[in-house]
Amino acid sequence: MLFALAVAAWGGRWGGATRAVASGTALAAAIIYYDVVHKRDPLSPLIMGLCRLLIYVTAALVVSGRIATPVLAGAAALLAYLIGLTYVAKQENLARFRNAWPLLFLAVPFLYAMPIVTDTVGGGLLYLGFLGWVVYSLSFLRPQRMNIPGAVVRLLAGICLLDALLLAGANEPMLAVAAIGGFILTRILQGYVAGT
């Protein structure tokens, strides 16, 4: 994907080539850094969120040559979600879940997306579906049901629902439907490929 974005940017098809390539390079560096040191780095939840944020930024730069405020705001909401999710993932090898306060980061997308609920019926349904999915995912962290990997894979699939919600808020219903398809496909593939 990074190669395709870089080729499109360098080809000048969409503009913003230099910034898009710089953003793509930063994305590649963040991914490599995360892969190499995420187990040892206490800031790895931030780095993982930064990787996803840079996907939004790079795509925006390739397509339009600029980063609009809604892209940054949506990327920031996604960053917060990824910080919360990655914190949960870092607890995977512990006997019990500690320090629940980082889970508050998972609430940020819901605060940001609140106006989407009132804009359209579809946006409201997506909001409620995403909320229900996150609550269900977090239920795997209860002491009597403790299954941290189960929570993590569900929260990972939930990224697609957040994407769908943000796309609905951007008045892109067909792309929102595609993101919901991504959620379904992710859950199916998680039956074959370990998500953690």
Residue ranges of model-derived segments:
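C-terminal membrane-associated helical module and adjoining short loops/tails
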Residues: 2-5, 14-16, 36-38, 50-196
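Multi-pass alpha-helical transmembrane bundle typical of ion/small-solute transporters
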Residues: 6-8, 19, 23, 32-33, ...
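Charged catalytic and DNA/RNA-contacting regions of genome-maintenance
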Residues: 46
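Short, non-helical or kinked segments that cap or interrupt transmembrane helices
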Residues: 41-43
